[in-house]
């Protein structure tokens, strides 16, 4: 999990301009990290590129927190 979490954290920090310490598994992209809907779509696209996978729109809607993203990626690698 550490490797996936580290890679996800780097993408979030780069995309949203938040501090690395704010990117914890329980952090909500919208409420805690200040992302808007477009930011979330762009994050999903970056995660798809980084992990060489496709995340369906239906699954993307269920990814609301950093932990959700890490869990999803780990279960689909």
Swiss-Prot record:
Protein name: Acyl carrier protein
Gene coding for it: acpP
GO cellular component terms attached to this protein's record: cytosol; membrane
UniProtKB keywords: Cytoplasm, Fatty acid biosynthesis, Fatty acid metabolism, Lipid biosynthesis, Lipid metabolism, Phosphopantetheine, Phosphoprotein
GO molecular function annotation: acyl binding; acyl carrier activity
Involved pathway(s): Lipid metabolism; fatty acid biosynthesis
SUPFAM superfamilies, A to Z: ACP-like
Every Carrier domain range: 2-77
UniProt cross-references to PROSITE patterns, sorted A to Z: CARRIER (PS50075), PHOSPHOPANTETHEINE (PS00012)
Main location: cytoplasm
Modified residues (O-(pantetheine 4'-phosphoryl)serine): 37
A Pfam family: PP-binding
Family statement drawn from the similarity comment of this UniProt entry: Belongs to the acyl carrier protein (ACP) family.
Biological processes per GO annotation: lipid A biosynthetic process
InterPro entries cross-referenced by the UniProt entry: ACP, ACP-like_sf, PP-bd_ACP, Ppantetheine_attach_site
Compartments, record wording: Cytoplasm
Source organism (scientific name): Bacillus cereus (strain ATCC 14579 / DSM 31 / CCUG 7414 / JCM 2152 / NBRC 15305 / NCIMB 9373 / NCTC 2599 / NRRL B-3711)
Domain of life: Bacteria
């Amino acid at each position: 999990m550490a490797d996936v979490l580290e890679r996800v954290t780097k993408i979030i920090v780069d995309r949203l301009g938040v501090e690395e310490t704010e990117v914890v598994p329980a952090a909500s992209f919208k409420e805690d990290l200040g992302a808007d809907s477009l930011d979330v779509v762009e994050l999903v696209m970056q995660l798809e590129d980084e992990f060489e996978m496709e995340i369906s729109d239906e699954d993307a809607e269920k990814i609301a927190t950093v932990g959700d993203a890490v869990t999803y990626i780990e279960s689909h690698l």
